[in-house]
């Protein structure tokens, strides 16, 4: 059976969630997915993370993937330069804000 890159990612995520581990690490987990599937997977990860007592770490360049995280760490040249939740990082108008505006677009509101 041949599966696409996105299908492989979805299967890997499902397998990880079914194991119910104490720690989940997702490194660019939705990078090969279209935006609708990304939102579905992100919602599933959020639901599972909130329903159980484990730590979930999301590593992503696509900020929409991490915007609902409890704590976001912004790295620049290997160092943490900002930290907070989505709203507080937008208020600071630092690097996270600039990246958010670049990814979402100048004409759209900064807070979703």
Language-model features and meaning:
Residues 1-92:
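ABC-family ATPase nucleotide-binding domain "signature/switch" substructure
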Residues 91-112:
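C-terminal boundary and immediately downstream tail of ABC-type ATPase nucleotide-binding domains
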């Amino acid at each position: 059976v041949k599966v696409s890159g996105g299908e492989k990612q979805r299967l890997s995520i499902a397998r990880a969630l079914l194991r119910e581990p104490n720690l989940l690490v997702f490194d660019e987990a939705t990078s090969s997915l279209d935006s609708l599937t990304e939102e579905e997977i992100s919602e599933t990860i959020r639901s599972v993370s909130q329903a159980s007592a484990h730590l979930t770490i999301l590593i992503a360049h696509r900020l929409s993937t991490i915007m609902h995280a409890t704590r976001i760490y912004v790295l620049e040249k290997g160092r943490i330069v900002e930290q907070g939740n989505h709203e507080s990082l937008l208020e600071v108008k630092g690097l996270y804000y600039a990246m958010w505006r670049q990814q979402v677009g100048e004409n759209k509101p900064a807070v979703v």
